[in-house]
Amino acid sequence: MANITAQMVKELRESTGAGMMDCKKALQEAEGNMEKAVDLLREKGLSKAAKKAGRVAAEGLVAIEMNDDNTVASMVEVNSETDFVAKNEDFKVFVKDAACMALATDKEDIASLLGETHKEGITLQEVLNNRVAKIGEKLDFRRFAKVVTNGQVAGYIHGGGKIGVLVEMETEARDAKVLELGKDVAMQVAAMNPKYVSRDEVDAEYIAHETEVLTQQALNEGKPANIVEKMVKGRLEKELKEVCLLEQTFVKNPDITVKQLVADVAKAVGSDIKVVKVVRFEVGEGIQKREENFAEEVAKQLK
């Protein structure tokens, strides 16, 4: 039997909202596999949220830069150890500079981008090293994304740089309404974090996995086998409307879907508009901050 630690139980509880004993039992049944334990809790109706195991804990900033005609955009995430440093002006300037360099570069990986020359006359990596020495805290240029399109691209920053979203739209229109639409869609993505743009992108593996979980969930609820299939179909349909961007209810107007919003703007500008890609960065996504017991920390300082 796998060794189930208190930390594993704590992580599963935080990611699902289930009770401590339920989390422990699920981990034991899943032999320590965190994702399988999440599925088991969902099947039993004990998970309050279909979150994946793991939590967001790192600090830092996301920044976006865009060219003048909204056909090229870049987005970067740079992490710091504390929120205090994330609010430091030197740190903010570095993140903005990194986004500007990402916008101008043809490089596709961080290592190559860090090797490019900064406006200070040294490499971006050397500038980063200097900031680390000045600020006195570890900084990490974690990732960047770039969108280049013949259509239009819009961006949105939420929470002062905690979440950033880029939205690529396929369209011939050059109208302020299109950019406003792009920002509205980006806000939707920031708030609702959809897995897919449209139902066409949903892969068969996801459908099979969710069908299995929902079927087991219905059976565990004691539903008759003859109506389980119908129930699963209905629940899966509801879930797809939640994970597919275009089928989501628009957060600024719950009377319409995002798909209807896009269609309305397309009609208003007299040109087809298709949302083809979204990129969403959330600061610290998937990174777990190091935690120490306060008593242990004090003990270390006394040694």
From Swiss-Prot:
It is found in: Cytoplasm. One of its GO terms (molecular function) is translation elongation factor activity. It holds the Pfam family EF_TS. InterPro entries: EF-Ts_dimer_sf, Transl_elong_EFTs/EF1B, Transl_elong_EFTs/EF1B_dimer, Transl_elong_Ts_CS, UBA-like_sf. Its main location: cytoplasm. Coiled coil: none annotated. Keywords: Cytoplasm, Elongation factor, Protein biosynthesis. GO terms for cellular component: cytoplasm. Residues 82-85 are annotated as: Involved in Mg(2+) ion dislocation from EF-Tu. The keyword Cell inner membrane does not apply. PANTHER family: ELONGATION FACTOR TS, ELONGATION FACTOR TS, MITOCHONDRIAL. Associates with the EF-Tu.GDP complex and induces the exchange of GDP to GTP. It remains bound to the aminoacyl-tRNA.EF-Tu.GTP complex up to the GTP hydrolysis stage on the ribosome. Belongs to the EF-Ts family. This is Elongation factor Ts. It comes from Clostridioides difficile (strain 630) (Peptoclostridium difficile). The lineage of its organism: Bacteria, Bacillati, Bacillota, Clostridia, Peptostreptococcales. The gene is tsf.
